[in-house]
């Protein structure tokens, strides 16, 4: 495999190599469960998302950590390093039963925390991401170049004109057109969790939905 297909960190995890395409899992851990398998966004304490990712990968459980390039310093000058774009966050594709079992019985998964939302009747519910929305989010968030940026979720509500991209490498992806700080973006927002944007999509490559 080519060198550019891997990233490393200068932290204590620098001895590990992680493939960029690890969210494309073929096999998932099989456990007895009658619950639906969903994409759960999980908070992870103390920037341990890559350690959790490594453990999930070893079990064959699909997961996704959004990554981007950031500048780091070295004795030879600054260089680009691929790092988590949103710290303390990992998306896990599993049933609630499997995730809870891992958290209860495997010490390495204790740092994971479910995220919740308030339902219409005021009750707390576990937050999960619909498959279609997660697929679109991963298609965009897995691209590491200057055309993709991650936004503060406080600046990126879902209010905006909902559209679908009709051509190009992101054909079929759905999102909203939103102006943020005088700039117009094509935005994919996971409420209260994450937001990724394409900085430019030609108007003739968009259709309303």
Which residues does each predicted region cover?
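Short coil-to-beta-strand transition motifs
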Residues: 157, 166-173
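Compositionally biased, intrinsically disordered low-complexity segments enriched in Pro/Arg/Gln/His
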Residues: 17-20
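Generic structural signal for buried aliphatic residues
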Residues: 161-163
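Acidic-enriched and Gly/Ser
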Residues: 2, 6-8, 13, 23-159, ...
């Amino acid at each position: 495999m080519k060198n550019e297909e891997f990233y490393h960190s200068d932290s204590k995890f620098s001895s590990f190599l992680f493939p960029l395409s690890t969210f494309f899992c073929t096999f998932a851990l099989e456990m007895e469960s009658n619950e639906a398998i969903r994409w759960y966004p999980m908070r992870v304490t103390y920037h341990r998302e890559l350690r959790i990712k490594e453990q999930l990968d070893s079990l064959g459980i699909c997961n996704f950590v959004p990554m981007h390039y950031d500048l780091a310093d070295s004795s030879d000058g600054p260089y680009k390093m691929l790092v988590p774009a949103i710290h303390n966050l990992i998306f896990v594709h599993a049933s609630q039963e499997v995730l809870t079992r891992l958290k209860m019985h495997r010490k390495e998964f204790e740092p994971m925390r479910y995220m919740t939302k308030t339902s219409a009747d005021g009750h707390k519910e576990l937050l999960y991401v619909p498959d279609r929305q997660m697929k679109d989010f991963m298609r965009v968030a897995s691209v590491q170049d200057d055309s993709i940026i991650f936004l503060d979720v406080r600046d990126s509500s879902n209010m905006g004109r909902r559209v679908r991209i009709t051509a190009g490498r992101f054909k079929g992806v759905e999102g909203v057109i939103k102006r943020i700080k005088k700039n117009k973006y094509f935005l994919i927002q996971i409420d209260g969790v994450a937001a990724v944007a394409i900085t430019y999509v030609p108007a003739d490559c968009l259709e309303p939905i």
